Amino acid sequence: MAAAAMAVSEAWPELELAERERRRELLLTGPGLEERVKAAGGRLPPRLFTLPLLHYLEVSGCGSLRAPGPGLAQGLPQLHSLVLRRNALGPGLSPELGPLPALRVLDLSGNALETLPPGEGLGPAEPPGLPQLQSLNLSGNRLRELPADLARCAPRLQSLNLTGNRLDAFPPELFRPGALPLLSELAAADNCLRELSPDIAHLASLKTLDLSNNQLTEIPAELADCPKLKEINFRGNRLRDKRLEKMVGGCQTKSILEYLRAGGRGGRSKGRQEASEKEDRKKRRERKQHRESGEGEEEVADSARLMLKVLHVSENPTPLTVRVSPEVKDVRPYIVGAIVRGMDLQPGNALRRFLNSQTKLHDDLCEKRTAATIATHDLQAVRGPLLYAARPPEDLKIVPLGRKEAKAKELVRQLQLEAEEQRKQKKRQSVSGLHRYLHLLDGKENYPCLVDAEGDVISFPPITNSEKTKIKKTTCNLFLEVTSATSLQLCKDIMDSLILRMAELSKSTSENKEEDMLSGTEADAGCGLSDPNLTLSSGKDGQCPLVVEQVRVVDLEGSLKVVYPSKTDLITLPPHVTVVR
């Protein structure tokens, strides 16, 4: 045994020195490293994982290193940087690499990786395997796909380098709203990417995007909605829009984004393209004249802007308040509320479009209502102050949308029976994703509910709203709520997205009614601010912005828990949205 220990000491003197001097950094490289790793079975020596003080570990240029070896995560819990570049890691990567709770930099470039651990990204997804990871370099490998839960595994990722792999698509989860809120640099040049999802607009912090030398044929116009994007590279892609292809080869990022924002993209006929080019030249001349005459450059884009006005609690003589009882903490602790005034749901299919956008948010950002739930109410029917509480299933009664009054326990059981019947009819092994939220309340002694000042339950999350506050075509002012058992920030992110969609719908509705308004034939001017004290002047395009009114959530003693929108909310919206505070 002593002889074996002596042999290890002689083979790995760097480890003995690091242990003796309590080093925080260790670099293993050089000509003798390959033979020693080969003798250790293509893995790092187990003794390396008995140095818990290490913050930085680099093993590079070793053609015999095929796997880090078991014990890395358990033995090096304080590791901040792990650099394993230009080795022979692959074709897979063992799950033992995570979790590493303190890791900030992971460099696996220049290896032979074909896959990452299936189902768990680079570590367990719940909780995140790499919760502090900021930089991930996977360039120069042979990856054909990324794990779907990569964003869950590394939610604080800021830089992702995928250059020089064999990827043909990004996983949709990577661009899910709020999935990677800090990602500022994405490089995936020299791959086989065929399509870029419009959902890339959800990367609110993206500054640099390099997708050169792929197989893209179209660049989504939504890319222009990334508010911080400063540098893009699409060279080496054969785009359908030849003018755009020429632009990406020589124009600045700003010009390309302006072209996308104006609607220029692949797939148009030659005649339409020439007409568009002529129109673009005309607009450029007009902008130049505006600049030379001292007029604002922003005037051209004013008609495309969305306006939101935040009304603070102090400006409202009768603010709505939500009180929270302590019992709800064990069931569904997080709630955010807001009031939106000035919606017009009467024209055409505006109401249906509003409800469809809410359903889409439930499917995407709310993860089929399992992460969070949205409820929208006709403010005229809401009697404040409101109470967010938890009640026994036998005592909680509600008049659900489209149904008769029922106890919560009976309603949930009925919905579960309906879901099971649907499963049998469609011959599925499990209930559809649409109904999975029904099981969130299994085993709960109390159910969450929102109660108005008259004692009526107006919301039973995540199950249903009440018929009492149902949204109708005549609804102008709405009370919005988002609840979650996951996090308060998720509630805020979803509320941001909901209000943005409402602003877009309001703008679209106003544009469709513009001719009637100009001709004076608009019959109903009742959709506005119901409170005469809450007035707002029109914007440059003659349209009034939506008013987003703050709602305070307090405990039973009146101490503030959260207010929305605060000064840190509604700040990651696209550049065409202006928030007046």
From Swiss-Prot:
One annotated GO biological process: phenylalanyl-tRNA aminoacylation
Gene3D superfamilies per UniProt: Phenylalanyl-trna Synthetase, Chain B, domain 3, Ribonuclease Inhibitor
LRR repeats, residue ranges: 78-97, 102-123, 132-154, 156-177, 182-204, 205-227, 228-248
Disordered: annotated span: 262-301
Disulphide bond pairs: none
Record PTM Phosphoserine, positions in chain: 314, 430, 519
Compositionally biased region (Basic and acidic residues): 271-280
Top-level taxonomy: Eukaryota, Metazoa, Chordata, Craniata, Vertebrata
Protein name as it appears in the record: Leucine-rich repeat-containing protein 47
Keywords noted in UniProt: Coiled coil, Leucine-rich repeat, Phosphoprotein, Repeat
GO molecular function, one term: phenylalanine-tRNA ligase activity
Coiled-coil region list: 401-436
Xref: SMART domains: B3_4 (SM00873), LRR_BAC (SM00364), LRR_TYP (SM00369)
Name of encoding gene: Lrrc47
